[in-house]
UniProtKB/Swiss-Prot annotation:
One of its GO terms (cellular component) is cytosol. It comes from Shewanella oneidensis (strain ATCC 700550 / JCM 31522 / CIP 106686 / LMG 19005 / NCIMB 14063 / MR-1). InterPro entries: DUF520, UPF0234-like_C, UPF0234_N, YajQ-like_sf. Belongs to the YajQ family. CDD domains: YajQ_like. Coiled coil: none annotated. This is Nucleotide-binding protein SO_3815. Nucleotide-binding protein. The lineage of its organism: Bacteria, Pseudomonadati, Pseudomonadota, Gammaproteobacteria, Alteromonadales. GO terms for molecular function: nucleotide binding. Keywords: Nucleotide-binding.
Length: 161
């Protein structure tokens, strides 16, 4: 029986490249000359540090642009609401969504069942496995999940015939 997995993951290498490109752009930007600003990456968390709250927002925009250029979906970013003020610097933490949370996975399963496509879907940890008799049904589910707006991008892997 054909099957595939629906996952949501960020490519670690592309994320690191986007952070490095953001650092390069930061060093060349005129509005950040002579300012204490940095972009640090560690364990799927990017820390943006600047002298002003407005500059932190600019750093988020720089990072978002570089992620787009590296084909990493910016909707995977989870930016803190308020920047943390310590001493003379402000810092923002940007986390990246890895895996599908259970409530979003339940929405996917419900959406697939409501579509009346003849497939079975089941939640397996942070992935959703979809199994069906016909490959066309699986491709219809892929199209359905792609057009749904659930707040994060999805990839389809482990396609088996």
């Amino acid at each position: 029986m054909p099957s595939f997995d629906i996952v949501s993951e960020v490519d670690e290498v592309e994320l690191r490249n986007a952070v490095e490109n953001s650092r390069r752009e930061l060093s060349g930007r005129f509005d950040f000359r002579g300012k204490d600003a940095s972009i640090d990456y560690k364990d799927h968390v990017v820390t943006l540090t600047a002298e002003d709250d407005f500059q932190c927002k600019q750093l988020v925009d720089i990072l978002r642009t570089q992620l787009s250029k590296r084909n990493v979906e910016p909707s995977t970013m989870d930016v803190d609401e308020k920047s943390v003020h310590s001493g003379k610097t402000f810092s923002l933490k940007v986390r990246f969504k890895q895996g599908i949370e259970t409530d979003i996975a339940k929405k996917i399963v419900k959406m697939v069942k409501d579509s009346k496509i003849k497939v079975q879907s089941q939640i397996q940890g942070d992935t959703v496995r979809v199994t069906g008799k016909a490959r066309d049904d699986l491709q219809a589910v892929m199209a359905l999940v792609r057009q749904a707006d659930l707040g994060q991008p999805f990839q389809f892997n482990n396609f088996r015939d």
